[in-house]
Amino acid sequence: MPQSVTRPRAVTTVSPQRLSFAGGGTDFPDFYQRHGGAVISATINKYLYVTVKRHSPLFNETYRLSYFKTEHVNTLDEIENDVARECLRLIHVDPPLFIATAADLPASSGLGSSSSFAVGLLYALHAMRGENVSAGQVAEEACHVEIDMLKRPIGKQDQYASAFGG
């Protein structure tokens, strides 16, 4: 008999990457809090895919990550991928977990790939908890991870573009 699943065993998200046309830099908190800001950007048909799944407790490690490198670790603090580590710290999902990414474009392409990753991973973690969240909430959480937790000198357009698309 089929059962409804409120907490899935696996989730895959697809997050768009973006092009910025104007206003880059006006989305930095230090700027827009004093002067306001406006950006013109659009997402493109190039995506970052994030899969989060529960892996078997038969594996020796608690967290398995596969992106341009592979990590097998037992604690959050051991995770080298800082965005993944802090997203997991913010939205706790009981391990053991496997996180894999694939992208249509290479990292450091200048098209917001780290923010697309943060947005996709946060959506997936919420889904693993059975939570349906808004694009605005995920965009703000991704900004919190990258700007507040990781202290990256970046603005907010990438996270919002990826979360809302368009």
Model region roles, listed by residue range:
Residues 133-166:
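Alpha/beta catalytic cores of group-transfer enzymes, especially the acyltransferase/condensing modules
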